[in-house]
A protein has these predicted regions:
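Short linear motifs at protein or domain termini
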Residues: 1-15
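C-terminal all-alpha effector/ligand-binding and dimerization domain
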Residues: 4, 16-159
Length: 159
């Protein structure tokens, strides 16, 4: 598998991608995320929460946590119109070398259900991913919550 953007994934599936920024700002790294990003609890993170759309309908919610010192001006970007991944590469020279992720099914809590326009406790596909730069440095911790009724994962497996 290779790392692809939400927009590329949606286009491959025949959807028109869209994005709404729900929130953006600086936060102190909680201990669990700090451990994943190999930083100290309390270090500054950029937190960007986006609603991802497919043909104008909610598909997922993404919570990106980026180590602020590697992308200090990233909050100035317009991530409703421009891909975060492209800004990281263009403005900070950050390209993803690899990522590690955990995938699980979870019931939608009320707040996510409202945002995704689904009944509470509906099935969500939850992905937690740590993405590493070409220097093998963890830069981003990403939580994605996909609607279980609209999204399926496809993998090709080899012996």
């Amino acid at each position: 598998m290779r790392i692809i953007s939400f927009a590329e994934d949606m286009r491959q599936r025949g959807f028109r991608p869209g994005t709404e920024v729900l929130s953006a700002g600086l936060v102190a790294a909680p201990p669990d995320i700090a451990e994943k990003l190999e930083i100290e609890p309390g270090d500054e993170l950029v937190r960007l929460e986006r609603l991802r759309l497919a043909d104008g309908e909610p598909m997922s919610v993404e919570e990106s946590h980026l180590v602020h010192r590697y992308c200090p001006g990233v909050l100035e970007g317009d991530y409703a119109s421009n891909p975060l991944r492209e800004a990281l590469e263009r403005d900070y020279g950050i390209r993803w070398l690899h990522a590690r992720q955990v995938i699980r099914a979870i019931p939608a809590p009320g707040d996510l259900a409202r945002t995704l326009s689904i009944p509470p406790r509906s099935a969500l596909l939850n992905i937690e991913r740590v993405s590493f730069s070409q220097q093998n440095t963890p830069i981003e911790f990403l939580r994605i919550y996909y609607r279980g009724d609209r999204y399926a994962l496809y993998n090709e497996l080899h012996e």
